[in-house]
Amino acid sequence: MKATKVKFYHKGDTLVYNADAFQLAEGSMLDALIRQLPGAELRKDGQIYVNGKFVDNLLLNGKDFFRGDNTVMLENLPNYMVSSINVYDKLGKNSKFAGYEMADDKQYVMDVKLKKQYSIGWTGNVEGGGGTKERYLGRFFAMRFTDHSRLAIYGNANNLNDSRKPGENDNWSPSNLGGGLKEQQFGGIDYFIDDRNGKYNLDGNVQVKHQETTSITHTNRKNFLSGGDTYERMVNSNRNQELIFNTSHRLYFEGKNINLELLPKINFHKFDNTTNYSSLSLSKDFASFGKKQLDSLFSMNLGKELLNFAINRNLQNGKLKGHTLETSISANSVIKFKNSPDNINLYADASYRDAKEEHFDHN
């Protein structure tokens, strides 16, 4: 007889997965482990479901990690560091401070617990690769742990159009792959500082992403007509550039009878999109002309040989550029009264938005 490890069990209202009970390929990250968890489902963009219920937040040792972007932890945390994965309903800080569950202050979370030997120290990984047609991938991840703080940094640069991985549960068709070439560079920093006495904590993250997508579509068509065949060539090119900057932070302070939480955020998105369209109809096959003549299709002055057989021509150029800036800060506080179950809840927020868009067309 051969003993097998228990893969999961319930501890009160918490569902606990034993990470060591799952066999994974060497070098696997957290995402590969979660895909094997019974009842768990990993979907596009890092969304996680357990027994059909959406997981609101993915935690690391009970703390936020790149809040709102699960993919950073999923793709960079080695599975061998994980001791267990706990799934449960977590009350917010205000509920814990007040001593009872407050409205809209509970989340369904997946909490990744690290093994003791990895709870203090450095960890990191680096990956690089290349392929045909000048495809490449390079990324790194490093993290520093102590019993009351954490600092993580990551970066990624690639021109891989398809970011899916084997085993993802996702509906896919060839149209999802997209056309053209997508180049992207992104990175970020995440930090957490916790007071040993639990009176305050500070956490936040900064992420930057640059992305450029270029696509060119060529279409050739022959029309069979009684009065003589005609030939058409159409070229459509697009270049889309984006710069995205996101940062969010949280400061929490807790006194004897009052607490305070501040949540500042900044989101910035800059875009620059260019479109060029050229089409030409001839009474003679395009194969009859040389490269120099055919290249003139993209210029204002059409080649003389093409001009002699031209039926109609269309040139269109477009440009769309602009930006969006959104900033906000919110504050909430709970004030307790001595020898009374009552309390006062205070909330305030302020926000600012600036957007600009310019559109140019030329025919």
Residue ranges and their predicted role:
Residues 1-23, 43-45, 51-55, 89, ...:
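Short, acidic, small-residue-rich periplasmic hinge/interaction motif at the N-terminus
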Residues 12-14, 43-45, 53-55, 80-82, ...:
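Extracytoplasmic
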Residues 24-28:
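Soluble non-cytosolic domains of exported or imported proteins
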Residues 31-66, 84, 94-104:
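Extracytoplasmic beta-strand/coil segments of soluble accessory domains associated
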Residues 63-92, 147:
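Short acidic/polar hinge/loop motifs at secondary-structure boundaries
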Residues 68-71, 91-134, 148-363:
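Primarily recognizes Gram-negative and organellar outer-membrane beta-barrels
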